[in-house]
């Protein structure tokens, strides 16, 4: 008998078009992966845009020492029980509000927090750091003023609502609030797995059901940053009778504070 011969099969061949498609898909996946990595690494640079302190003087500034940072607080002292804590937007110099707030809220001591890295405050901003710093500011203010209103704007609404859920605030005002930053980021980056990449999610909806004080949600009619649906979803998570939603007509996300109704609405809520 003759031994069986094993024939060696030739490796499969692919047409030039298939090879080109393979390399194109591989390159696309590589670029997508690199984009995801870049988004993860630089996400806080997109969320936090520190601004210098352009309006304060030494008389209108206090330093609040906290673990890992010294925080600058723009202040307008006022004797009495009432105080207002302001937590601003992601690219806001909060000291710019001091003059107008002083006129609008003459019966409140004012404390406007410069986040870590903003307005001369040391340290680096993060959700955990901002929340801890807001608690520290509240505790320091509460020792002098037991009747505290908390006002948050844009990014600061997420900090403000968390603060109000953990401390005995008297009133809460949320200007251009969102349901969560994760929700906003997912809309801005629809082709990325934001849920898995984002570390600072600012999930305001988690805190809203815990709020038991009068709360005003102040929306801009033409808000180009925070969709109205996000604000409405947040409003729906409050307990019945706690929150009211007011829309200022004809203004956008960054111009809402220019409207005459802006300070009037906040003053009425206080």
Can you annotate each of these PLM segments?
Residues 222-226, 253-254:
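Acidic catalytic loop of the alpha/beta-hydrolase fold
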Residues 251-261:
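Catalytic histidine-centered segment of alpha/beta-hydrolase-like enzymes
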Residues 173-183, 200-204:
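Active-site nucleophile loop of the alpha/beta-hydrolase fold
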Residues 20, 24-65:
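An N-terminal hydrophobic leader/cap segment in hydrolases
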């Amino acid at each position: 008998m003759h031994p069986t011969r094993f024939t060696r099969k030739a490796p499969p061949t692919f047409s030039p078009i298939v090879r080109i498609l393979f390399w194109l898909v591989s390159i696309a996946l590589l670029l997508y992966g690199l984009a995801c990595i870049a988004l993860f690494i630089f996400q806080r640079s997109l969320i936090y845009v520190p601004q210098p302190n352009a309006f304060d003087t030494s008389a209108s500034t206090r330093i609040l020492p906290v673990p890992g940072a010294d925080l600058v607080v723009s202040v307008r002292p006022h004797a009495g029980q009432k105080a207002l804590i302001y937590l601003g937007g992601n690219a806001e110099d909060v000291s710019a509000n001091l003059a107008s707030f002083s006129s609008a809220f003459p019966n409140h001591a004012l404390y406007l927090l410069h986040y870590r890295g903003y307005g001369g405050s040391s340290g680096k901003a993060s959700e955990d750091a901002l929340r801890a710093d807001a608690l520290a500011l509240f505790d320091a203010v509460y020792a002098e003023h037991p009747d505290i209103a908390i006002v948050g704007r844009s990014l600061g609404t997420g900090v403000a609502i968390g603060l109000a859920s953990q401390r005995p605030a008297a009133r809460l005002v949320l200007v251009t609030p969102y349901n969560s930053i994760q929700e906003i980021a997912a809309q801005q980056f629809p082709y990325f797995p934001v849920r898995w990449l984002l570390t600072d999610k600012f999930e305001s909806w988690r805190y809203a059901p815990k709020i038991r004080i009068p709360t005003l949600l102040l929306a801009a009619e033409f808000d180009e940053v925070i969709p109205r649906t996000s604000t409405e979803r947040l409003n729906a998570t409050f307990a019945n009778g706690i929150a009211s939603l007011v829309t200022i007509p004809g203004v956008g996300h960054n111009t809402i504070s220019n409207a005459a109704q802006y300070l009037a609405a906040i003053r009425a809520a206080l």
